[in-house]
Structures are given as C-alpha cells and as structure tokens.
C-alpha cells in the first residue's frame, strides 16, 4: 500500500508541475508570431514607401519637391497618414527615414518611425495622405535620431510649395524640414506642426533581425536588409544632383553603398 501512496504522490507532483508549466506557457506572449508580424509589416512599409516616392516623382504638381529632394540631407516617407477630423483632428501613420552621406552622396538603409498628433479646429471629414518630409539641415537629421521629436517645437517644419509652376525658390529655406503631401480624402493639405515623430523600435529590430537604433542604421550603417535596395536605388536616382556645367548626374550620388544588401 505504501508504494501505491508513493506513486500517487509522485503523480500528483507531476500533475502540479505540468499545471504550472501550462499556466506559465499560456501567460507568455507569442513572441515568434509577433516578431514575424512586425517583420512583415516593416517589409510592406518599405515597398509602399518606394511606391509613394515614385508617385511623387511622376506628379506634375511636385516639381518643387523634385528640385528640393536633390538638396535634402534626409527623407522621411509615410505612405499613408490617416487623419480623422471633426472639431478635433487626430493623425497617425508609419514612416521610413533615410539619410544621405554628405561625403559620398550615398543613402542609408531605412529606419522605422511613426507620426502622430492632434489638432483642434473646425475641420470636416477624414483624410488619408501620402506624406514625404524633406530634412534640409543637420539639425533636422540629428533631431530624428532621438526617440521622438515634436515638429514645430524641437525642430522647424514648413509646408513645401506644391502645384504646377510652384518653384523651389518659394520654399521656406529656414525650416529644418519641408513637408509635402498628396491627399486622398475630403480636404487637402496636411498640417504636421505639433505632430510627434517617434522611433518604432520593434519594426527596426524585426526588419534587421537584431536590436538596432536609428544611429546604427542611419549613421554607423551597420544594419543590412537587401529588401531595401529597391527603395534606395529609386531614391538615389531621384535625388541625384546635377553638375551645373555639364548637366550630368554626379557619379557619387548614383553609386549606392551595397552595405544594405
């Protein structure tokens, strides 16, 4: 009888341990699926950003954008910035940010960000816009290397000139960042003054397969993902500077560092 009692105790202990294991296991979030979802989201965002850039480059209303892009130190692309508005407007969307090396003209791999903000005013309807921010100064680039930055507060932002015949010379060249948007909704123009641009660390980590910071990606350039090459190549061609004498593309602006591959 003693051996039966001992067996029962052992069985009870195993059942207890199994219950604890099952409970703890269910409490742990599904890290792998979440990581996979982040990776997929990041990959899709990079491709959508490429399509947004291409659409801006082919838009007759974006002549000033094309000219100013050649002078930009960085480019932040949000393929879809959603904004719902009625008295109080709230906006939000994901974006990728790439930085140009001033010495070589080569563009970095993309770092992932989110744009969010709220505004108060008499507004009607909702809006979905493609938005590209041209970062025109070192201060603008540096501000985006932190965890978050408030546009119009920590760094100056102004709307870029849009429309057929709009000249780059009419842009507010004192602004650190110039914003350009193509609206799909009921009211045009996106005011980003007061919006917050913040790093999406999870997307950065998932896309590059390890923990990385914006500085790792944009400055040190030691993060790689070949999927970004199509975006970088399109940006390199679009932002290539022309020599004033011959009107030819500068070689340094066209030769892209293969380190992202």
Label each residue range with its predicted role.
Residues 1, 25, 98-102:
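Short regulatory "switch" loops immediately downstream of catalytic or recognition motifs
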Residues 1-12:
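N-terminal secretory signal peptides that target proteins for export/translocation
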Residues 11-14, 135:
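Aromatic-residue hotspot detector
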Residues 14-30:
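Bacterial N-terminal signal peptides
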Residues 35-261:
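Small-residue-enriched, tightly packed secondary-structure blocks
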């Amino acid at each position: 009888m003693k051996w039966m009692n001992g067996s029962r105790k052992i069985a009870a202990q195993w059942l207890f341990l199994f219950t604890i294991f099952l409970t703890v296991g269910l409490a742990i979030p599904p890290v792998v699926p979440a990581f996979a979802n982040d990776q997929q989201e990041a990959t899709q965002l990079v491709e959508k950003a490429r399509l947004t850039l291409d659409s801006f480059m082919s838009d007759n209303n974006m002549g000033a954008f094309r000219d100013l892009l050649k002078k930009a130190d960085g480019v932040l692309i949000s393929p879809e910035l959603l904004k719902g508005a009625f008295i109080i407007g709230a906006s939000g969307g994901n974006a990728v940010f790439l930085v140009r090396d001033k010495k070589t003209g080569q563009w970095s791999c993309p770092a992932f960000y989110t744009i969010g903000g709220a505004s108060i005013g008499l507004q009607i309807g909702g809006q979905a816009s493609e938005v590209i921010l041209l970062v025109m100064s070192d201060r603008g680039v540096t501000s985006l290397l932190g965890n978050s930055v408030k546009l119009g507060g920590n760094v100056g932002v102004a709307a870029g000139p849009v429309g057929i015949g709009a000249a780059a010379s009419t842009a507010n060249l004192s602004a650190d960042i110039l914003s350009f948007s193509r609206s799909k909704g009921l009211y045009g123009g996106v005011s980003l003054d007061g919006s917050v641009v913040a790093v999406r660390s999870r997307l950065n980590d998932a896309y590059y397969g390890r923990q990385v910071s914006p500085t790792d990606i944009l400055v040190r350039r030691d993060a790689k993902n070949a999927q970004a090459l199509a975006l970088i190549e399109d940006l390199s061609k679009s932002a290539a500077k022309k020599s004033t004498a011959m009107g030819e593309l500068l070689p340094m602006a066209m030769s892209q560092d293969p380190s992202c591959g």
